[in-house]
């Protein structure tokens, strides 16, 4: 059972996501939000935590379910996304992982139209939610866990 609930029209959920880069740090894998936006926008791959599941277990499960790969994960950020205008509150644990080669990914979840491999040098031209994730993607040294509070998710 996913950790999500709704109270008086306000939605809350807890999510684990991951910045998956190639070894050269030139590319990153993103998830298309086409199903919930009116234009092309992206999230980091991942999904909701299940009840009694920790955030690292969740990201391992989600990536294995969606992409059929096993990676080593490092927690790099906690994002609090609070969007009053949309009555939306999400707590997101962001992890980092590297992959030898994106060609080795076998997409199991809804086909490749759900995912996009993006050149990091082009990241500023792409709509990514929350927008603080762009800074995390461009970072090459994940030495400390960061904490961001986002009131404007778009």
Residue ranges of predicted features:
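Acidic, metal-coordinating catalytic segment for phosphate/diphosphate chemistry
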Residues: 1-17
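Nudix hydrolase/Nudix homology domain
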Residues: 37-41, 110-154
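Conserved Nudix-box catalytic region and its N-terminal flanking loop in Nudix hydrolases
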Residues: 26-65
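Residue-level preference for beta-strand/loop junctions
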Residues: 10-12, 40, 87-91
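Residues embedded in well-ordered beta-strands
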Residues: 17-19, 27-29, 94-96
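Generic short beta-strand segments
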Residues: 1, 76-81
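Unchanged
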Residues: 49-72, 81-132
């Amino acid at each position: 059972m996913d950790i999500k609930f709704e109270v008086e029209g306000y939605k809350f959920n807890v999510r684990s996501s991951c910045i998956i880069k190639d070894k050269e740090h030139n590319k990153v894998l993103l998830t298309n939000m086409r199903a919930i936006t009116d234009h092309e926008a992206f999230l980091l791959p991942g999904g909701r935590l299940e009840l009694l599941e920790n955030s690292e277990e969740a990201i391992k499960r989600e990536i294995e379910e969606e992409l059929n790969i096993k990676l080593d994960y490092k927690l790099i950020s906690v994002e609090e996304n609070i969007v009053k205008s949309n009555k939306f509150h999400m707590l997101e644990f962001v992890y980092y992982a590297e992959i030898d080669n994106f060609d080795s990914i076998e997409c199991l979840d809804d086909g490749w139209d759900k995912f996009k491999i993006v050149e990091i040098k082009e990241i500023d031209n792409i709509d990514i939610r929350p927008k603080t994730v762009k800074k995390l993607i461009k970072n090459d040294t994940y030495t400390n866990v960061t904490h961001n509070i986002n009131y404007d998710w778009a």
